[in-house]
Amino acid sequence: KTAYYGLFSMQHRGQEASGISASYNHQIKTIKNRGLVTEVFDNDSFEILQGQMAIGHNRYSTAGSDSVLDAQPVSAKYSLGEISIVHNGNLINKHEVRERLIEDGAIFQSNMDTENILHLIAKSKKENLQDRIIEALEQIVGAYCLLILSRSKMFVVRDPYGIRPLSIGRLKDGGYIVASETCAFDLVGATYVRDVAPGEMIVFEEGKSAFKSIELFEAKDPRLCAFEYIYFARPDSMIDGKNVYQIRKKLGEILADKSSCKADFVVPVPDSGVPAALGYAARSNIPFEMAIVRNHYVG
């Protein structure tokens, strides 16, 4: 249930669909569907999704459609066995890559750029999965955080610019958890270890207590998506060592310094705007009021 609780704690990152793949007894089982985490999974799901390794995904569509075919994880059988992939990001050369793959005979079942990566891995002639992943990544350009699950290993990759966040936590039983936000660690009682570095691959292997780190690409100048700090992330998360709530509040203070005004109240647009409004109100000595109330169960 660790993967389930992790997805539940990050429901804010996507509400269209949810899915989990788990590796058990040299088989990968996947359950995914449209809807919230609590709507997709039940007790019967946990009976199916057994194992020591699992990956999960909440969908917020930036590419593809809202069809269940575009829900993740994306799983397939290929010459080396089975794999399942989840991807947070966007590939800017997805159309060129897809056209080339189709010309080579690939058949696509979804509109997701994630499926491009799956085909590149399957098409590779490298002898092991790790080398196939590396070869595939050399052909894509854009933002990506990837979790790739095989029957006995899990590969974690962050793009060279670190556009999307990705962190590693340690569970109380000695296992590891990887998530886009550290708020997922809190719900399962995990402690923060470190962020996955831009351009880094982390390899977890079943039965081994330590993970392996590989520098795939030289890290570029950090280009973390600005929307993570101001909108996407939960305020209690840490991203690249910085607390999201404190960053938002500080931005409000800076705005008050640079663009002060006479006003009766400082009113936030909930929910992401609340910390910034608090910072603005405190710095400008203008009363803070919740004049806009959001209904969390509509829209």
Predicted segments with their positions:
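Conserved short alpha-helical segments that host acidic/polar catalytic motifs at enzyme active sites
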Residues: 1-198, 203-264, 269
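Residue-level detector of flexible, active-site-proximal loop/helix-junction positions
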Residues: 62, 273, 295
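Short alpha-helical
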Residues: 92, 274-275
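Alpha-helix boundary/capping detector
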Residues: 123, 127, 281-282, 292-293
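Structured, non-catalytic alpha/beta "coupling" segments that mediate domain-domain communication
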Residues: 198-201, 205, 275-289
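ATP/NTP-dependent adenylation/nucleotidyl-transfer catalytic domains that generate, transfer
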Residues: 250-253, 275, 296-297
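Short, glycine/charge-rich flexible loops or terminal/linker lids adjacent to PRPP-binding catalytic cores
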Residues: 285-299
